[in-house]
């Protein structure tokens, strides 16, 4: 199995207040070259509900609400989009990313991202684990995801 390198840059600027970290982009996200691109992933739907707006330009939405997006993993082996299959992990330099920003809190989307963050990343910013919005976590109702992610909206104020 060959190593796959994360194919696109973080969404971040100096005014970012929160950083949302996934594990590694899905096959569809890698093809579409942006975060949470699989239409079955509920991340963007949750954001629309929390911020009470339709999101047409995802990157502009993130900048407008001071949200940075990235993934913990810089490169890895992976089968399809399954976090369970991830191996040979190299992590992104998250501490350097947030140096010249207003980021005061980091959220991870799912257990794998949180576990890898805790294991590999040395950063003084508080981190909060949130449930995965992936279709692999379909048992979690949309209302429950929105409730769990409310802290993101509150942290963007």
Q: Which residue ranges define each predicted feature?
A:
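A polyanion-binding, active-site-adjacent surface
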Residues: 2-105, 111-116, 120, 124-138, ...
């Amino acid at each position: 199995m060959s190593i796959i390198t994360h194919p696109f840059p973080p969404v971040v600027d100096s005014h970012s207040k929160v950083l949302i970290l996934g594990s590694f982009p899905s096959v569809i996200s890698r093809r579409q070259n942006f975060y949470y691109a699989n239409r079955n992933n509920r991340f963007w739907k949750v954001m629309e509900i929390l911020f009470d707006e339709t999101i047409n330009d995802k990157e502009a939405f993130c900048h407008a609400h001071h949200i940075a997006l990235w993934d913990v993993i810089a490169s890895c082996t992976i089968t399809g989009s399954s976090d369970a299959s991830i191996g040979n992990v190299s992590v992104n330099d998250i501490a350097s990313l947030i140096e010249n920003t207003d980021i005061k809190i980091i959220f991870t989307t799912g257990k794998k991202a949180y576990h890898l963050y805790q294991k590999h990343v040395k950063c003084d910013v508080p981190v909060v684990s949130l449930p995965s919005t992936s279709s692999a976590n379909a048992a979690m109702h949309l209302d429950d995801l929105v409730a769990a992610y409310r802290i993101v909206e509150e942290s963007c104020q």
